[in-house]
């Protein structure tokens, strides 16, 4: 079993930074979310960017030779790039034992991505990852590592049976985190699954699926800790709890797959009901990204269900969705009334379901064209033989009764469905439905993207430290901002998140996203002392907003009324789509549990691969403006800022 990430939209601005105070917090967030902030995994990753690899000769490790060329994935063979990656790992850490994770793929930018997990006595060290990016020339492009290099236990704990019963670990996790699952010694039975000391628990109540436990090591505080990785999915949280294998009241770390956010149809580019009018759209899917939104290779659906998503209301807030209400029309005509004055929300549920289904599908198709496809771990029932694991469309719940004034997205590994919950907001009269604010929907969906790309599709645990989790929130805000740019926008325009749904002028972040340092003064070093992923994410999105506008000013905005990007030689021709492409490619390049500096380097590497570094100076100037220039350094207590750019810029 694997971990899952639950990410959420909402963190209301508060006095978390040393800047002028906010207006009083007037939004009451209610949900059943478990606070795991005390159990972030440690930040351990190193990233060797492309210029470092070239300087120290790592790029001389190659597979069988072939000629370079365009961005086509056919330039690499699977045997070659996996062999190259394996050779690098063996050369870099010759004494480490490891296993190849079965999620390697060649992205549409031509880079092969390979991921490894370190093992000891055949037991995974769960937070050790080695990712290798192999270029189109068959050489190592860049790589990252969080492999453990300390002392190894002298004996195999499985042979000695030197650990507790997994039932005790389950109870320890439940008691420590107050997980709403009932399990009693004597009533819960364990069933071995998958080998490698993995068990399923029968006889519990409260979880969506039977909990599991796997014996793994966790790297922490300079040593290895033998733990039971207990997996419990209770809807608002889908947790991997690392319980000490001997002291079951001690928890070493927690991963939550669920990510919460703040947020006939409003067309793409219309952020909310104040931003434009509803329209009747016909056949809106891209054939490149979807054959049709209502087929999945198994049948034709005359409701809001298809290969990419299944959308329904969920007023009970429960876990089941198959039998929930969806609008149905044999001609696929989904026209339902909605105005902002309508109340209660249930009176316009069909309009809400249709809007959520539309927004989720369009975003799926756009991301597909930008590189988040089957091989990269996207969300589809049927992958049409193109790689990756299927059976994982996105479950889209609107008017979800499990909370208000928020939204969330659960991201399990590739092959298991993502789950989005959109809530009603009670901060205005009449209440507002978050599914009608596209920025919230896109924010949530992007949690699924960043978690699938970072560390590989099979590993949803790679944004589980404080800083990487914060960047997850920042990426989500960034994409939510980019997709509703208007033709006449300039870098002088400010952007907000959640303003319509919350009814709060200025939205739900501490500052609007602005390139004006007076309007938004956030710098890299402002992350010092922050304990909220949303506050950290606001800094990261602020930095990415500088990247966006530097690229737009060089390459233009493009046609904002055209959803599908235009490419030349595999590169988006406008700055808006180029920014999204580089950020997505950077996610796939960066190591598991990245920090700001590593993510910056990965974006610059993405440009080096895609354009041969044509935008190097635009990128460095953007990062440097917010203190993430040459010489900036990560330290969780005292980050080092820098406004320097490289020579030649």
Curated annotation (Swiss-Prot):
Active-site annotation: 444
Cofactor needs: Zn(2+)
CDD domains: M36
Propeptide part(s) removed at maturation, as residue ranges: 19-260
Predominant cellular place of this UniProt entry's protein: secreted
Keywords: Glycoprotein, Hydrolase, Metal-binding, Metalloprotease, Protease, Secreted, Signal, Virulence, Zinc, Zymogen
Signal peptide (from-to): 1-18
Gene3D superfamilies membership: 3.10.170.10, Neutral Protease Domain 2
GO MF term (any one): metalloendopeptidase activity
Major enzyme class: hydrolase
Family per record: Belongs to the peptidase M36 family.
Protein name: Extracellular metalloproteinase 4
């Amino acid at each position: 079993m694997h971990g899952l990430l639950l990410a959420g939209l909402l963190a209301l601005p508060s006095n978390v930074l040393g800047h002028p105070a906010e207006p009083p917090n007037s939004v009451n967030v209610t949900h059943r979310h478990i606070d795991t902030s005390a159990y972030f995994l440690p930040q351990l990753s190193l990233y060797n960017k492309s210029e470092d690899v070239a300087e120290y000769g790592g790029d001389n490790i190659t597979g069988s030779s072939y000629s370079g060329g365009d961005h086509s994935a056919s330039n690499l063979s699977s045997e070659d790039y996996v062999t190259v990656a394996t050779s690098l790992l063996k050369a870099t850490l010759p004494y480490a034992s490891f296993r190849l994770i079965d999620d390697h793929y060649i992205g549409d930018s031509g880079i092969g991505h390979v991921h490894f997990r370190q093992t000891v006595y055949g037991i995974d060290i769960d937070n050790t990852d080695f990712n290798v990016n192999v270029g189109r020339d068959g050489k190592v492009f860049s790589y990252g590592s969080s492999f453990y290099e300390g002392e190894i236990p002298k004996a195999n704990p499985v042979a000695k049976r030197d650990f507790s019963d997994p039932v005790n670990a389950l109870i320890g996790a439940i008691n420590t985190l107050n997980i709403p699952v009932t399990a009693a010694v004597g009533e819960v039975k364990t069933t071995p699954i998958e080998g490698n000391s993995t068990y399923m628990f029968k006889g519990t109540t409260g979880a969506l699926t039977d909990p599991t436990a796997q014996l793994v090591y966790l790297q922490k505080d300079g040593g290895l800790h033998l733990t039971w990785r207990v997996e419990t999915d209770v809807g608002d949280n889908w947790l991997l709890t690392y319980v000490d294998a001997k002291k079951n009241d001690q928890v070493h770390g927690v991963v939550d797959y669920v990510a919460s956010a703040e947020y006939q149809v409003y067309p793409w580019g219309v952020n909310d009901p104040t931003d434009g009018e509803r329209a009747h759209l016909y056949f809106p899917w891209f054939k490149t990204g979807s054959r049709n939104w209502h087929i999945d290779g198994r049948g034709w659906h005359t409701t809001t269900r298809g290969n990419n998503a299944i959308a329904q209301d969920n007023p009970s807030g429960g876990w089941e969705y198959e039998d929930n209400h969806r609008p149905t029309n044999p001609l696929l005509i989904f026209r339902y009334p909605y105005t902002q004055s309508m109340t209660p929300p249930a009176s316009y549920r069909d309009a809400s379901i249709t809007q959520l289904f539309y927004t989720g599908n369009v975003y799926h198709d756009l991301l597909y064209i930008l590189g988040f496809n089957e091989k990269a771990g996207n969300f589809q029932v049927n992958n049409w033989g193109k790689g990756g694991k299927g059976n994982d469309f996105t479950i889209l719940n609107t008017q979800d009764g499990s909370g208000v004034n928020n939204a969330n997205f659960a991201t399990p590994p590739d092959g298991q469905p993502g789950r989005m919950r959109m809530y009603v907001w009670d901060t205005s009269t009449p209440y507002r439905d978050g599914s009608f604010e596209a920025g919230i929907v896109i924010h949530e969906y992007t949690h699924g993207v960043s978690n699938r790309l970072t560390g590989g599709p099979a590993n949803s645990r790679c944004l589980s430290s404080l800083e990487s989790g914060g960047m997850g929130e920042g990426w989500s805000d960034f994409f939510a901002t980019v997709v509703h740019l208007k033709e006449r926008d300039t870098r002088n325009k400010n952007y907000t998140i959640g303003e319509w749904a919350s009814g709060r002028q200025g939205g739900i972040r501490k500052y609007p996203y602005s390139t004006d340092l007076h309007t938004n003064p956030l710098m890299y070093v402002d992350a010092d002392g922050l304990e909220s992923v949303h506050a950290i994410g606001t800094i990261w999105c602020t930095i990415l907003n500088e990247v966006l506008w530097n690229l737009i000013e060089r390459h233009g905005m493009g046609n904002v009324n055209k959803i599908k990007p235009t490419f030349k030689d595999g590169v988006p021709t406008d700055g808006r789509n180029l920014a999204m492409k580089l950020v997505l490619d950077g996610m796939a390049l960066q190591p598991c549990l990245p920090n700001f500096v590593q993510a910056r380097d990965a974006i610059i590497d993405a440009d080096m691969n895609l354009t041969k570094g044509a935008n190097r100076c635009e990128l460095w100037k953007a990062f440097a403006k917010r203190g993430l220039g040459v010489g900036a350094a990560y330290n969780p207590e005292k980050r080092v800022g820098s406004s320097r750019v490289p020579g030649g810029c």
